[in-house]
Curated annotation (Swiss-Prot):
GO terms for molecular function: adenosylhomocysteinase activity. Signal peptide: none annotated. This is Adenosylhomocysteinase. NAD(+) binds at residues 196-198, 230, 259-264, 282, 317, 338-340, 383. The gene is ahcY. The lineage of its organism: Bacteria, Pseudomonadati, Pseudomonadota, Alphaproteobacteria, Hyphomicrobiales.
C-alpha cells in the first residue's frame, strides 16, 4: 500500500478539485507551455533536475510546475509573496503529489519557514536548480552562506520586520543544521532562472560585487516576458485588483502612477482605459518624455498627493510614497503597489495609526487628524493580493521562457560562469511564435532575396540584440 503523501502545507486540500478544473481551463490559454511539453516531453531534458521554485502559487504557475514535472524534473514549491497564493491552485498541486508550501495570507514567519522547506528534500538531498521570482530563494542561499562563513554581523542589523524574521531563520538554521549546510546547498545548485525586475537587480548587484554563487538566467529581460507580462499583463490585472478591493467607480477619477517602465506603462494604460485621468511620475528623462508623448501629465508625487484619488507605485524602488505624501492625500484616497516588494510605500510608518480591516487585503487607516486612507494588500502586489494576477495567455509566454531557461542551465552545466545571462533571441522569437496561432495571427514569410537584402536569415532572428521593440 502506498504511503499517503503529506509533504505539503496548503489551506484546504479539499479545494483540489476546483483547482484542477481551473488548471484545465488555463492549459487551453497557455499554448507555449503545452507546446513545450509536446516537444520536449519525450526527451526528458530535466530528468535529474531538482528544482526549488519560489514564484506566486497561482493557477498559471500550476501549469508551469506540471510542465517542469512532465519534462522530468522533481519540484518543490513556495509562493514568493504572502498574499499571492491561490489556495485552490496550491491544493491541486499538493493533490498531484508535488510538494508545495503556500497559503494565501500566510505570516512572514511562515513565508520564510516555507522557503527553508524548499531546500530540504524528502530524500535528504538538496535542490540543484532554483526557479525564482524576486530573488528570495536565491538570497536565502547567499545570505545563509555569508553567515556560515563567519560574517554574522549583518544578522543583527535588520531594516524591516521581514529582514528581522529572515535573519532569525538563518541563525536558527546555523544552530540546527550540520556545519557546512549552506556551503553544500551553494555547491549543488547549478543555476537559477529569475522571473522579475527586482530579482534581476539583485542578481546583477551580486555579479558586480563578485558574490554570485552560481550562473543565472535573467528571464525578465526576454522580450516575450518584459514587453508582454509586465506591460499587457498589468494593463489587464491592475484595475481588476482595484475594483475587487474597493468597488470604486474608476471613470472620472484622477490616478497617479509612480514609474513608467514596462509595468508603469501597463498600469497607466489600465487606468486610462478604465476612464481615469492619469498622471505619472518618473526619474528617467527618457521614460518621462515617453509618458508625456503618450498624453500623460508628468508630475512629482508632491504635486499629485493632494489631487489624485488613486495612487499606484510601479518603480521597483523604495520610499516612493512617504508618510508626508500620505498625510497630504484626500480623505479615503486609495493607495496600492504593483512592484514586487512592499517598501515602495512607507507602510511601516503607519504601524501606530488606527487600522480597520474592511475585508481581506483591504485596510482603512485613520490618521491622527481623522483623515482616512484605503491601503490594498498592505502595500504588496495589488493584482495578486486583491485579484487573480495576470491572465493565463500572457503568463504562458513568461513561463515558457522560464522552462527554456531551466533546460538551458541544467543541460549545459559547466558552460556558464557565475554571471547573469539572457536567453538568445532565437528562443525569444520561438516563444512568440508558439503563441500566434492561438490568437489567429498569420506571419508574413520573407523571401530569400528579401532576407539577404536586410542581412537576416529567412527563419530569423529578425532583429539585432540591441533592438528595443
Amino acid at each position: 500500500m502506498t504511503a499517503k503523501f503529506t509533504d505539503y502545507i496548503v489551506k484546504d486540500i479539499g479545494l483540489a478539485e476546483f483547482g484542477r478544473k481551473e488548471i484545465s481551463l488555463a492549459e487551453t490559454e497557455m499554448p507555449g507551455l503545452m507546446a513545450t511539453r509536446e516537444e520536449y516531453g519525450p526527451k526528458q531534458p530535466l530528468k535529474g533536475a531538482k528544482i526549488a521554485g519560489s514564484l506566486h502559487m497561482t493557477i498559471q504557475t500550476a501549469v508551469l510546475i506540471e510542465t517542469l514535472v512532465a519534462l522530468g524534473a522533481e519540484v518543490r514549491w513556495v509562493s514568493c509573496n504572502i498574499y499571492s497564493t491561490q489556495d485552490h491552485a496550491a491544493a491541486a498541486i499538493a493533490a498531484a503529489g508535488i510538494p508545495v508550501f503556500a497559503v494565501k495570507g500566510e505570516t512572514l514567519k511562515d513565508y520564510w519557514d516555507y522557503t527553508a522547506k524548499l531546500f530540504d528534500w524528502s530524500d535528504g538531498g538538496t535542490p540543484n536548480m532554483i526557479l525564482d521570482d524576486g530573488g528570495d530563494a536565491t538570497m536565502f542561499v547567499h545570505q545563509g552562506l555569508r553567515a556560515e562563513n563567519g560574517d554574522t554581523m549583518f544578522l543583527d542589523q535588520h531594516n524591516s520586520e521581514e529582514e528581522e524574521i529572515f535573519f532569525a531563520l538563518i541563525k536558527r538554521i546555523l544552530k540546527e543544521k550540520p556545519k557546512g549546510y549552506f556551503a553544500t546547498l551553494a555547491k549543488n545548485i547549478k543555476g537559477v532562472s529569475e522571473e522579475t525586475t527586482t530579482g534581476v537587480h539583485r542578481l546583477y548587484d551580486m555579479e558586480k560585487a563578485g558574490k554570485l554563487l552560481f550562473p543565472a538566467i535573467n528571464v525578465n529581460d526576454s522580450v516575450t516576458k518584459s514587453k508582454f507580462d509586465n506591460l499587457y499583463g498589468c494593463r489587464e490585472s491592475l484595475v481588476d485588483g482595484i475594483r475587487r478591493g474597493t468597488d470604486v467607480m474608476l471613470s472620472g477619477k484622477v490616478a497617479m502612477v509612480a514609474g513608467f517602465g514596462d509595468v508603469g506603462k501597463g498600469s497607466a494604460a489600465s487606468l486610462r482605459q478604465a476612464g481615469c485621468r492619469v498622471m505619472v511620475s518618473e526619474v528617467d528623462p527618457i521614460c518621462a518624455l515617453q509618458a508625456a508623448m503618450e498624453g500623460y501629465q508628468v508630475v512629482t508625487m508632491e504635486d499629485a498627493a493632494p489631487i489624485a484619488d488613486i495612487f499606484v507605485t510601479a518603480t521597483g524602488n523604495k520610499d516612493i510614497i512617504t508618510i508626508e505624501h500620505m498625510r497630504a492625500m484626500k480623505d479615503r484616497a486609495i493607495v496600492c503597489n504593483i512592484g514586487h516588494f512592499d517598501n515602495e510605500i512607507q507602510v511601516a510608518t503607519l504601524k501606530n495609526m488606527k487600522w480597520d480591516n474592511i475585508k481581506p487585503q483591504v485596510d482603512e487607516i485613520t490618521f491622527p487628524d481623522g483623515k482616512r486612507m484605503i491601503l490594498l494588500s498592505e502595500g504588496r502586489l495589488v493584482n495578486l493580493g486583491n485579484a487573480m494576477g495576470h491572465p493565463s495567455f500572457v503568463m504562458s509566454a513568461s513561463f515558457t521562457n522560464q522552462t527554456l531557461a531551466q533546460i538551458e542551465l541544467f543541460q549545459n552545466q559547466g558552460k556558464y560562469e557565475k554571471k547573469v545571462y539572457v536567453l538568445p533571441k532565437t528562443l525569444d522569437e520561438k516563444v512568440a511564435r508558439l503563441h500566434l496561432a492561438k490568437i489567429g495571427v498569420k506571419l508574413t514569410e520573407l523571401r530569400k532575396d528579401q532576407a539577404d537584402y536586410i542581412g537576416v536569415k529567412v527563419e530569423g532572428p529578425f532583429k539585432a540584440d540591441h533592438y528595443r521593440y
